[in-house]
UniProtKB/Swiss-Prot annotation:
It catalyses: uridine(34) in tRNA + AH2 + O2 = 5-hydroxyuridine(34) in tRNA + A + H2O. Pfam families: Rhodanese, Rhodanese_C, UPF0176_N. Belongs to the TrhO family. Keywords: Oxidoreductase, tRNA processing. GO terms for molecular function: oxidoreductase activity, acting on paired donors, with incorporation or reduction of molecular oxygen. This is tRNA uridine(34) hydroxylase. Catalyzes oxygen-dependent 5-hydroxyuridine (ho5U) modification at position 34 in tRNAs. Residues 124-218 form the Rhodanese domain. InterPro entries: Rhodanese-like_dom (IPR001763), Rhodanese-like_dom_sf (IPR036873), Rhodanese_C (IPR022111), TrhO (IPR020936), TRHO_N (IPR040503). NCBIfam families: PRK00142.1-3 (NF001135). SUPFAM superfamilies: Rhodanese/Cell cycle control phosphatase (SSF52821). Disulfide bonds: none annotated.
Length: 319
């Protein structure tokens, strides 16, 4: 049995003074020796925390004693250690950012909830568009079979992508999904205000679908990206597959790294061998960038040799 747990949760509810709440909540979390990342806004709370089983259970009881969060659902993962290095509770304008001119309140408008078994039926329906509401790098390491991959790098780009592809989605049944459900609460509501009529969402997100005793994560390919030190977690308990592809050679891969150029920091899938071969950098420009954190540890001679090994030249050698 694991000694630690990771809790994923959110709740759209009114918080009158997010800044004061954040300070008090941070103090409470630290007292319970939790680590994690929590966003607080006037519209609610969105968090992931890790801690010992005893500490996380205490936290869930603590939240249940607050009427605003008494019915909040926690997605619970067993873990061998903390999933975060520190504890942060930050006040924000939104708990998920769509950055709309007119914000959407999921308590007033949101898509129809589909439970995991209903969502599985939708996955098998050829007349339904399954729309991934996550970022491109989240999709690339794992997604539902047949889902549409929006070409976006952050959530606030999604409405623009929808408008650009409106003709392909018009008059279609749309079912959207995300990690734990919070993004879809707001996004599905926006879809309805934007004129799409038949809009549904996976209730509780991928995390809930993967733990459901009937679906057991079936029809999910790859792993689910998570925003903590675990990076990705398994979902499909029936017939797991690998869909991630190494950025450099296209071979199956589920290992994410960040480009060593801090001005880039792009997340790419790469094996240990290719990380070393390509100097943990996504491009030649990033490899030769003076701020590159990987190449700073190399001597000039070794840097030149490593570049030549992949048929590249250092700037100093260019005439």
């Amino acid at each position: 049995m694991s000694d630690y747990q990771v809790l994923l949760y959110y709740k759209y509810t009114t918080i009158d003074d997010p800044e004061t709440f954040a300070k008090e909540h941070l103090a409470a979390c630290k007292e319970m020796e939790l680590k994690g990342r929590i966003l607080v806004a006037s519209e609610g709370i969105n968090g992931t925390v890790s801690g010992t089983v005893e500490a996380t259970n205490k936290y869930m009881d603590y939240m249940a004693n607050d009427a605003r969060f008494a019915d909040m659902v926690f997605k619970i993962d067993a873990a061998d250690s903390h999933a975060f290095k520190k504890m942060h509770v930050r006040p924000r304008a939104e708990i998920v950012s769509l950055s709309l001119e007119e914000d959407v309140n999921p308590l007033e408008v949101t898509g129809t909830y589909l439970e995991p078994t209903e969502f599985r039926e939708a996955l098998l329906d050829e007349d339904t568009v399954i729309l991934d509401a996550r970022n491109d790098y989240e999709f690339d390491i794992g997604h539902f079979r047949g889902a549409v991959r929006p070409d976006i790098q952050n959530f606030r780009e999604l409405p623009g992508w929808i408008e650009e592809n409106r003709d392909q989605l018009a008059d279609k049944k749309i079912v959207t999904y995300c990690t734990g459900g919070i993004r879809c609460e707001k996004f599905s509501g926006w879809l309805k205000t934007a004129g799409f009529e038949d809009v549904s969402q996976l209730h509780g997100g991928i995390a809930t679908y993967g733990k459901n005793e009937e679906t057991k994560g079936e029809l999910w390919d790859g792993q689910m990206y998570v925003f903590d030190e675990r990076i990705a977690v398994p979902i499909n308990q029936v017939n797991p597959t690998i869909v991630g592809k190494d950025y450099f050679d296209g071979t199956p891969c589920e290992r994410y790294i960040n480009c060593a150029n801090p001005y880039c920091n792009k997340q790419i899938l790469a094996s240990i061998e290719n990380e070393e071969k390509y100097l943990r950098s996504c491009s030649h420009e990033c490899r030769v960038h003076p701020a590159n954190l990987y190449t700073k540890e190399l001597s000039k001679e070794e840097f030149t040799e490593r570049l030549q090994a992949i048929s590249e030249t250092s700037p100093e050698m260019v005439q």
